[in-house]
Structure formats: structure tokens, C-alpha cells
């Protein structure tokens, strides 16, 4: 687990704190669209294009952040998130397609002998300088040093709980590791000397060895400070091999794009779809699926197996940290779906797909 490497004074702390708050409050406006640009592009950034999308009210977000901070300062959750020992023998078997939940949106996928890692985050705090932001609730059971060499890292967007500087720098030491990133993030990675970058736009496809890797849409937003709101793209990813294919949903609200992705690139044998950080709905609804919507997204992308992600690791919303899988499985049972195909993993658990 990473720790802060240098000392910060009180002024640095409050600057980081209020910067993080402002990042989520203000939907910074972007330039008007022009006919020459794709619909999700603007003059100086990106936007969501689903006709049902409506940005959360900034004042509502501010009031929620303040009240949430007050409530959390007087209460602590005691729920235990199930975890298990990492099965490195199974993961290192190149002839077995496997998937491991490391925590939050970080997963390890073995697909046709190659190793994929999604949104690697090992830091204790998901926030500026690893100083303020969402604190890790559940410790990871797998260290970076335990992992085999990673072939491809998929990044969904630049929020701190999905793009962690210390983690990507650790993986970038392996010069054979390639990073697939949404449009606009190449400069950030290059500033830290990270190479092997594949920057892609929605629906763009790239051949990598025997795989076709597709940058697919999501309904979300981006930003790491009050001044870069939606300057870089957010995405999901479809990975298509000769026999196997999987979908990484990243971070997204429910939108029509799930069905489009399923129609264009499905069926998938595996999908990694978020189920957590969904309350209150007036704040989270525009950018995060709830568990019921996650079930529908699973059906929309036409997947045979699902690993529920984006829960149990960081305290990011109002629902109890162990509530997402309960609501998710209730919806699975209500719809009469195959329980075994969507059963939530323990942190550190590996399954064959």
C-alpha cells in the first residue's frame, strides 16, 4: 500500500480539500458544439450525449458533500467485506482464462494468454496527493509485487479512484506494458515519462496482436481539479480475442450505450460492470448505475458472466458499503437470472471464465 512520500502543511491540506470539493460541484461549461466535431466532442472538452442525461445540480452536490462530511465524522461503518488469498497459480496459468477482483474497479483478466489490468489503484486514499478524498475501507489482498507481468492496462477515466499515479508509475517500469487510455489523457501520462500509450476515442478500434481493443462509450465525467472538468474523455472498453471477449464498464450511469455496445460487439463471455456509489440518486444517478440498472446493463451488453465492481473498497456514497451486492442479488433473483453467472466476488478471488 502506498503512503504519502512528503510532508504537507495545513495550507496544502485545505487547498487539496477545497479543490476536490469544487471539482464535483461546478459543471464547468465548455464551448459550443460545431458540426465538424463528433457529438460527444465540444470546443474544449467532451460531453455525454444520451438524450436522458441531466447534470446534477451544483448546489445539491455542495449541500450533500457538506452533510456527508458531517455525518461521516460522527459515524463509522463496521461491515466486513469478504476477501480471500490470491490464487497466483491459477492466474499464472497462461492456458486458463481467469478473472480476479483486486478491489473497486481494479481487476486482473487473463484472456487468451495475455494479462489485462483495469483501472489500477493501490493507494490508501483516492484523491489529490493521496491526501484528501475517499479513504480505503478494505485493504487489498494482492500486492503489485505479487502480480505477473501485465501486458495491457485499460484506463476508463481520470478520477482518482480509477487513475492512481503511484500505481501506474509502478506498472510503467515494465517497458513492455501498454496503456490504453481515453482521448485527452496522453499528455498526463507522457508528463510522467510513461510510454506505450494508445489514446483512443469512442468507437475507435485498434489491433493489438491477436486482439481488437475498442474504446466504447460511458456516461460519466472527468476531472482531477476544479479547472479541468470534462477536458479528457471517459470510456468503457471492449476486448475481442479470437475466441474470447470481455467488456470493462469503467464508471457509468445507465444509458442507451450499453445496448449499442452489446449489439455491436457482443456477446461477451465476461463483463466487469459497476454496482456501487449510487445514493443519493439525484446526485449519483446521472453518473453511476444503481444495482438494478447494473443488472440491466449486464443484459444489454449481452454477457454470459459478470464481475460486479466499484463497491466494497472506498466509501464514496450514502449507501452502506456492503449494500450494493445485496441490492444487486435481489434484482437478479427478481428477474430469475442465473445466480452463479453474476455472483459477487470476494476481494482477491479468482474465477475461470
Language-model regions: role of each:
Residues 2-133, 140-146, 182-250, 269-276, 327-349, ...:
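Metallo-beta-lactamase
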Residues 30-31, 37-41, 48, 143-144, ...:
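Cap/insert and terminal regions of metallo-dependent hydrolase folds
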Residues 106-112, 207-269, 285-293:
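Catalytic core of the metallo-beta-lactamase
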Residues 109, 119, 157, 213, ...:
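Divalent metal-coordination and catalytic microenvironments
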Residues 120-122, 158, 218-219, 250-252, ...:
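Active-site metal-binding loops of divalent metal-dependent hydrolases
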Residues 122-139, 221-228, 279-288, 315:
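Acidic/histidine-rich helix-loop elements
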Residues 132-181, 196, 266-272:
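Active-site metal-binding motif and surrounding structural segment of the metallo-beta-lactamase
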Amino acid at each position: 500500500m502506498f503512503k504519502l512520500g512528503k510532508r504537507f502543511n495545513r495550507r496544502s491540506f485545505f487547498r487539496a480539500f477545497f479543490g476536490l470539493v469544487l471539482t464535483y460541484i461546478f459543471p464547468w461549461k465548455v464551448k459550443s458544439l460545431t458540426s465538424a466535431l463528433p457529438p460527444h466532442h465540444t470546443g474544449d472538452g467532451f460531453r455525454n450525449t444520451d438524450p436522458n442525461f441531466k447534470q446534477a445540480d451544483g448546489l445539491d452536490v455542495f449541500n450533500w458533500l457538506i452533510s456527508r462530511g458531517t455525518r461521516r465524522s460522527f459515524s463509522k461503518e463496521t461491515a466486513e467485506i469478504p476477501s480471500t488469498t490470491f490464487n497466483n497459480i491459477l492466474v499464472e496459468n497462461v492456458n486458463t482464462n481467469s478473472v480476479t477482483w483486486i478491489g473497486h474497479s481494479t481487476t486482473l483478466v487473463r484472456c487468451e494468454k495475455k494479462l489485462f489490468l483495469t483501472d489500477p489503484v493501490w493507494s490508501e486514499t483516492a484523491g489529490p496527493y493521496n491526501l484528501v478524498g475517499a479513504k480505503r475501507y478494505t485493504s487489498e489482498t494482492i500486492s503489485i509485487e505479487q502480480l505477473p507481468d501485465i501486458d495491457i492496462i485499460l484506463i476508463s477515466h481520470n478520477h482518482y479512484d480509477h487513475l492512481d499515479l503511484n500505481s501506474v508509475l509502478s506498472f510503467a517500469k515494465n517497458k513492455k506494458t501498454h496503456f490504453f487510455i481515453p482521448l485527452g489523457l496522453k499528455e498526463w501520462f507522457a508528463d510522467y515519462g510513461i510510454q506505450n500509450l494508445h489514446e483512443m476515442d469512442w468507437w475507435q478500434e485498434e489491433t493489438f496482436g491477436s486482439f481488437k481493443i475498442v474504446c466504447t462509450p460511458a456516461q460519466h465525467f472527468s476531472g482531477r481539479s476544479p479547472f479541468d472538468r470534462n477536458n479528457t474523455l471517459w470510456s468503457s472498453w471492449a476486448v475481442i480475442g479470437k475466441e474470447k471477449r470481455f467488456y470493462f464498464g469503467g464508471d457509468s450511469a445507465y444509458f442507451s450505450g450499453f445496448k449499442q455496445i452489446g449489439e455491436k460487439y457482443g456477446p461477451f463471455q465476461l463483463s466487469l460492470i459497476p454496482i456501487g456509489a449510487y445514493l443519493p440518486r439525484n446526485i449519483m444517478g446521472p453518473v453511476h448505475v444503481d444495482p438494478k440498472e447494473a443488472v440491466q446493463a449486464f443484459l444489454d451488453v449481452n454477457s454470459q458472466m459478470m464481475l460486479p465492481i466499484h463497491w466494497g473498497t472506498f466509501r464514496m456514497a450514502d449507501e452502506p458499503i456492503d449494500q450494493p451486492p445485496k441490492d444487486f442479488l435481489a434484482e437478479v433473483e427478481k428477474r430469475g437470472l442465473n445466480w452463479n453467472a453474476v455472483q459477487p466476488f470476494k476481494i482477491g478471488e479468482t474465477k475461470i471464465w
